[in-house]
Amino acid sequence: MTTEIRASASPGEVRVALLHDGTLTDYAIWRPGAPDGVGDIHRGHVLKSVHAMAGAFVAIDGAEGFLPDSEGAKGLTEGTPVIVRVTRAAQGGKGPRLSARIGAEPPDIDVSGGVALLRRGPDPITRFVTAWPDATLTTDSQVLAARLRGLSVRIDVVADAFDDALATEVDALSEMMVELPGGARIAIYPTPALVAIDVDSGGTVAGGRDRLGHHRALNQAVIPALARQIRLRNLSGAIVVDLAGMPVRRRAALAPALTAALAEDPLRPRFLGFTGLGLAEILRSRVHPPLHEVLSGPHATGLAALRAIAANLGTDPRRMPALRAAPSIVTALRRDKVALDDLATRAGQALVLRADPDMREGNWRMESRDG
């Protein structure tokens, strides 16, 4: 099996695809100016111990995280300094999850002093290279390639890390409807409590005496694609799936296929069984934010605008436009100095940002710098 890591860089963002034998297997977005923080080591202090939650809230650099008793909070009192590692990124409206179990303390970690970020955790490329050391790494950024020279992997620099087919497949991950070969489709509905997934035959199963058999075959064929979409989109926490067509009592026959498909996922999601309504229950660990959260909000929109501007530049920095956008987008970009500096380096000049209170949330446009 050949394994490839493809890293497509744009200002402030690197889209990272993992492919096995040419098939997209895993996907992540890395924002160097605003990483999700998983694996970061912080020097923090206890804000408040909450016995009802069996843990404590800890102030860390730029955030407030939760340290469970089982991960080292037991016995800590308000104001106590503590070295912690982020084990789960902030997501779903909740702050990061922490652990005081950081393993052997690195020699350069300074345990004295106030709240501070002491060390960054691994980025997605490093994680993929660590898990698949025989992979090849391809990127379209000389700057990124130089930054990654310390990794024990061959790095190739090309004009476009994502070909048209891969770019199309990655772009489709932002859609909540997945069209499958043969006409079936998967609809994904994230909610604050869980992720609901509906499998629809799309009219591919005709009536007749063996309608049940056709639905069973359809679901058997869909299940690997379902597990793949869960992994690519990093859907996590409680996941319930309504499979197509089969009576509730007959769905148990699909349990082995679900278990086998989920076994390929490094996070080892668990198939818990079927509810009384016939919904398949899956539990997948929350670590990094799900893709639909990563792709939403003013920062994500602003970085998409920078990607479009960089693509529009080509090799001629004289084509550098100004960006007019909703104020929330401009504010988010101004906070990401890495992204703005990246674009300025490419263009040889800084981007002019114009906050327009008359523009709706999420809206932006390129315009003349002289306008």
Positions of the model-derived regions?
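Short, structured coil segments at secondary-structure junctions
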Residues: 61-62, 151, 347
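Extended acidic low-complexity intrinsically disordered segments
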Residues: 51, 63-65, 146, 327-329, ...
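Short, acidic/hydrophobic/Gly-rich beta-strand patch recurrent on exposed beta strands
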Residues: 17-18, 56-61, 66-68, 85, ...
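Extended, charged alpha/beta regions that create polyanion-binding interfaces
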Residues: 1-36, 40-43, 47, 81, ...
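Short small-residue beta-strand/loop micro-motif enriched in glycine and branched aliphatics
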Residues: 26, 65-68, 203-209
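Conserved glycine-centered short motifs in functionally critical loops
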Residues: 54-58, 90-100, 182-370
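Beta-strand/loop nucleic-acid-binding surfaces
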Residues: 28-33, 57, 62-75
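Alpha-helical multi-pass transmembrane bundles of energy-transducing inner-membrane proteins
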Residues: 65-78, 89, 93, 243-244
